[in-house]
Amino acid sequence: AHTSLWHTAWVDENDEYDPTRKPDGNAIKGIEDTMELLRDYKSLDDSTVVVSIKYLVHLVGDMHCPTHVKYPGIKGFNIYVDGRKLNYHGVWDSYVLDCSVRWSGMEFQHILDRCTKREIKAITAGSVRDWFHDCAVYCRQIYVLAQPDQQFKSPDVWEDFLNPALPI
C-alpha cells in the first residue's frame, strides 16, 4: 500500500525534517497530506474521513517512537536485557510499553481531558515540522543511553536506561 513508507521520517544534521530522503513517502509527508485532505472533510465520504483520522492518530504515535525518527549516520542495533536480545527499534516500539503502566481508554481520556485551554493551545502550537524538529531533538538522546550489544539487567534497565529517557 502507499502508506507503507509513512512510518518514519528523516532529519538532517540539525534535526530539521529532510524531505529529500524518501520523498515519495514518509510520516511527515503523510501527516501533512492527510491534514490537507481533511481540510475539506465535509466533501469527503465518511469512510475516507474515518481512515484519514486513523492514519493521523497512528502516524503521530509513530513520530513519538524515537526510532521512527531517522538520523544521518545512525543505524539500528540490538541490546540485551537480562540476557534477552532485543532489537533497539522494538525496545521503543513495544518493550517500553509492555513494561509500563497500562491505562484503559477511559483512564487515558481522563488524563487528556484535564488539559486547560492554555495547555491545549501550547500543545497544538506550531506546524507539523516544528513539532517533528522538537521531537527529533529530544529523541536523539536514546542513542547516547545505549550502545550496540550493551547489556542491561532488571531493574537497572529502568534506572540506567529507560528512566533517563522519560517522558519519551
Q: Where on the chain are the PLM-derived regions?
A:
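N-terminal, motif-rich segments that launch catalysis or mediate targeting to/interaction with membranes
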Residues: 1-59, 66-168
